[in-house]
């Protein structure tokens, strides 16, 4: 293989850190690298004013300037990237929740941004626009991701989880095949994304499953 430049897609870096956090509990070097990544978030990660997580890893002044200019002079690019960011909002927050669950701590500034991002996830705007992006229900399933995010950041907001689980099932569940195979081009991967439910607290998972309604075709 070849050593390439830094991957500038933020969720790739974030999920690499979150996955390492799950696997490297006793590894001092791994934990040091994760903490270094978290420390750099203040400079290299940002959100829009409303809390939407920016998709690009904003490393260096030139990269930040180039990304900002593209969003201004290319309206179509801005619209497409905003919808992509909305589709990845819960996928990113899920990884942040994994890091918090693993005991890693964030600066006050970064944690404020995280809370703002969670609030945006609960906003009317997010609930409207997420249906317009191909990166949501058919790709990054909010119905599996939001319950875990809620359990970490806002465990009292159980009704929010009920809503998203139902929306995911309505969009994706095929009662004939008993699988998450509707409205997706990659049914095997989409079915496999059920793994994201394993981080729900056991008691919470049971309560949720008792209250959801499974659609019939």
Summary of predicted features, one role per range:
Residues 1-217:
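Glycan-recognition and catalytic cores of secretory/periplasmic carbohydrate-active enzymes
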């Amino acid at each position: 293989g070849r050593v390439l430049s830094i991957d500038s897609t933020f969720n790739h870096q974030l999920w690499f850190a979150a996955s390492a956090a799950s696997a490297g509990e006793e590894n001092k070097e791994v934990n040091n690298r994760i903490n270094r990544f978290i420390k750099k978030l203040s400079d290299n990660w940002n959100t829009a004013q409303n809390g939407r997580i920016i998709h690009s890893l904003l490393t260096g002044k030139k990269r930040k300037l180039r990304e900002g200019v593209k969003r201004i002079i290319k309206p179509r690019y801005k619209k497409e990237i905003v919808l992509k960011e909305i589709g990845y909002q819960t996928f990113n927050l899920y990884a942040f929740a994994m890091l918090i669950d693993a005991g890693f701590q964030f600066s006050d500034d970064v944690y404020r941004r995280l809370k703002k991002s969670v609030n945006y996830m609960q906003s009317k705007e997010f609930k409207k626009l997420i249906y317009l992006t191909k990166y949501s229900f058919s790709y990054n399933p909010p119905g599996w991701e939001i319950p875990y995010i809620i359990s970490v950041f806002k465990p009292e907001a159980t009704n929010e989880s009920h809503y998203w689980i139902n929306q995911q099932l309505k969009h994706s569940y095929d009662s004939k095949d008993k699988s998450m195979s509707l409205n997706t081009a990659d049914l095997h991967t989409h079915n496999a994304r059920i793994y994201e439910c394993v981080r729900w607290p056991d008691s919470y998972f049971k309560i949720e499953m008792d209250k959801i309604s499974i659609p019939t075709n």
